[in-house]
Amino acid sequence: MQCTGAKILMECLVEQGVDTIFGYPGGTILNVYDELYNYEGDGRIKHILTAHEQGACHAADGYARSTGRVGVCFATSGPGCTNLVTGIATAYMDSSPIVCITCNVGTSLLGKDSFQEVDITGITMPITKCNYLVRSVDELADVVREAFAIARSGRPGPVLIDIPKNVTAEKADYEPLPRSAHGTSGRLGKLMKRSSQNFKAPEPDHRDIDKLVEMIAASKKPLLICGGGVVRARAHHEFEALANRIDSPVAITVMGAGGFRGRNPLTTGMIGMHGSQASNMAVDACDLLIAV
């Protein structure tokens, strides 16, 4: 069916399971907000208006950390998109899956120093896993789907999609994403295989596990480091059981905060520049360091 770029964007967000968007409107993104109004009206997507675009990006980051799902934020061109930079950098450093959607001036105005034209894809290249400038409405759906697959897969992180205003108004055929990758070929098939419905976390090699067990058994002063992976995997109980089983002290990273009970006598506190002396000395003294 024929849809505007704005509607294609919203349909793709719905099919990716997005239920909350954080953002702040502006001139170039108005077509998207006009379409968002319909989706918020029927309860499919909730929009949270922030006081500043940086707040929207940080909120999307917080949403991703607390739910384990991809956070989404909207921003307009110029100062709107540049205000996202700190939030994007934070998500990149902390491996938080977010998709930032910005709108730019029309394609005919790109590269002409137009009002509020900013090369946001160039600015964010070092702090995103991938970013896109969508020049044709025909490629919009595939770009959105690929962005979510990239944000989720491997080491999670931020992805940015910049859409010129005219692309949000132009029309193209929209093909809903199939529920299964069966019978789907080409780029869409590859995207389906990388989607959240079909993505499987990597499984450990049992030979490596056996080797680790041998190393632990031979160690006299092992040290466990509780990192962000414990929190993201919600493996708090399993990690604590491991620490208790091998009777190893536990140092905690900033991202691992909350992954190990502070009242457990095995904890040495936070590690690093702002960490405890006990944790940092334990790193120097251990004969086996296990970072999780």
Whereabouts are the PLM-identified features?
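N-terminal alpha/beta PP-like core and its mobile active-site loop of ThDP/TPP-dependent enzymes
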Residues: 1-292
